[in-house]
Amino acid sequence: MDELELIERAKEGNKSALNTLLTQNFPILKGYIIKITGSPDVAQDVIQEALLKAVLNIKKFNPKAKFSTWLITIGTNVYRDMLRKTKRIVPLEEDIIAEDYNTEKIVMSNMEYKEILDILNSMPYEKKAVFILKHYYNYKYEEIAKILNCPIGTVRSRLHNCIKNIISELERKDMMR
């Protein structure tokens, strides 16, 4: 059974189809949330709430996007709400930096991994989220804009500023060759 068929059956109340959808997409949601929160404990809370919201709102899902994108959007919103409530940003885990980059590949290859993480952790959530979605999960700008509920131009600007900040900070620390 393909994803669209599972979605239609889940919308009709088929618990088995919904369970299959959630099981297939759980690793993607979990990986993203752990990376964005940096804390397995916080991630567990966000994931549980996101899955609950997905179950309760399955009939509202519009299959124009992938189911995993919808789950990540819900998870992002849950975490964003949590940040608003707690007014603190949780650091990222050290496994956030992916090995394969596009334009940043040269810059990233010259830097100390830990320093990049420290710099990334000091940035606002919005910039971190864009960086993670683009470079770790290889989402397109349009998909990131939908997930974060902002214009594509804002996504591009946040990513550009994030990379610019990383480069600037590394130059300041005299780590660029």
For every predicted segment, state its role.
Residues 3, 89-114, 118:
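Internal acidic/polar
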Residues 7-31, 128:
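A short, charge-rich alpha-helical start-of-domain segment used by transcription regulators
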Residues 11-12, 51-66, 86:
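Sigma70-family region 2
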Residues 22-40, 57, 120, 169-172:
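Amphipathic, Lys/Arg- and hydrophobic-enriched alpha-helical face
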Residues 31, 45-52, 65-77:
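Structural recognition of an alpha-helix C-terminal capping motif at a helix-to-coil junction
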Residues 59-62, 73-93, 161:
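Arg/Lys-rich amphipathic alpha helix in sigma70-family domain 2
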Residues 80, 127, 146-173:
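DNA-recognition helix of helix-turn-helix
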Residues 130-134:
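A short pre-motif secondary-structure segment
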